[in-house]
């Protein structure tokens, strides 16, 4: 039995979960609404504000899907009730971030500023010139946008310059040693 899959998922009072016939789950809460279609073999039930996921057999595919489905549902419920955020730091001389409308503008050592437009449901905040915070209800989308921002100038191992996640430790290398 999947340790994650057999955990019961308690639904907060301000969140509503609706199940459709083709295993589509819609979760609505104070921060927004998320919808996702799950594998038809997974049995998803809602009883007394508790969400359960069951699998039909112990086949390898069903065992894998069991925990994954439970985790995705848990992230949906957490996303619409609390939301997710991912912090990024800009490290380097002259590296700075700013907002222009809803676009994020990054000056990270290129000859031109890099503009990133967030997709719908994703909010980008710039609390300071060297900090960027990506917020949203969908954990997958928040992580993907944060990864796209980091990929603009990922941290290099010699000086550590670049865009890194908050709390990320960059593995440093020693430069060439002189003879």
Curated annotation (Swiss-Prot):
Keywords: Ribonucleoprotein, Ribosomal protein, RNA-binding, rRNA-binding. It holds the Pfam family Ribosomal_L6. This is Large ribosomal subunit protein uL6. InterPro entries: Ribosomal_uL6-like, Ribosomal_uL6-like_a/b-dom_sf, Ribosomal_uL6_a/b-dom, Ribosomal_uL6_bac-type, Ribosomal_uL6_CS. GO terms for cellular component: cytosolic large ribosomal subunit. The keyword RNA-binding applies. Part of the 50S ribosomal subunit. GO terms for biological process: cytoplasmic translation. GO terms for molecular function: rRNA binding; structural constituent of ribosome. SUPFAM superfamilies: Ribosomal protein L6. This protein binds to the 23S rRNA, and is important in its secondary structure. It is located near the subunit interface in the base of the L7/L12 stalk, and near the tRNA binding site of the peptidyltransferase center. Belongs to the universal ribosomal protein uL6 family. The keyword Repeat does not apply.
């Amino acid at each position: 039995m999947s340790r994650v899959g057999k955990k019961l998922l308690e639904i907060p009072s301000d969140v509503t979960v609706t199940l459709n016939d083709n295993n589509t789950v819609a979760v609505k809460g104070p921060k927004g609404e998320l919808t996702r279609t799950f594998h038809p073999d997974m049995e998803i039930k809602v009883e007394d504000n508790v969400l359960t996921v069951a699998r039909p057999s112990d086949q390898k595919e069903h065992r894998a899907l069991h925990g994954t489905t439970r985790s995705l549902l848990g992230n949906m419920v957490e996303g619409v009730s609390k939301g997710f955020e991912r912090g990024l730091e800009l490290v380097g001389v002259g590296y700075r971030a700013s907002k222009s409308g809803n676009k994020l503008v990054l000056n990270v050592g290129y000859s031109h500023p890099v503009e990133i437009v967030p997709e719908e449901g994703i909010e980008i905040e710039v609390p300071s010139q060297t900090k960027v915070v990506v917020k949203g209800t969908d954990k997958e989308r928040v992580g993907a946008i944060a990864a796209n921002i980091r990929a603009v100038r990922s941290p290099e191992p010699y000086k550590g310059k670049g865009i890194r996640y908050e709390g990320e430790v960059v593995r440093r290398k020693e430069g060439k040693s002189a003879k």
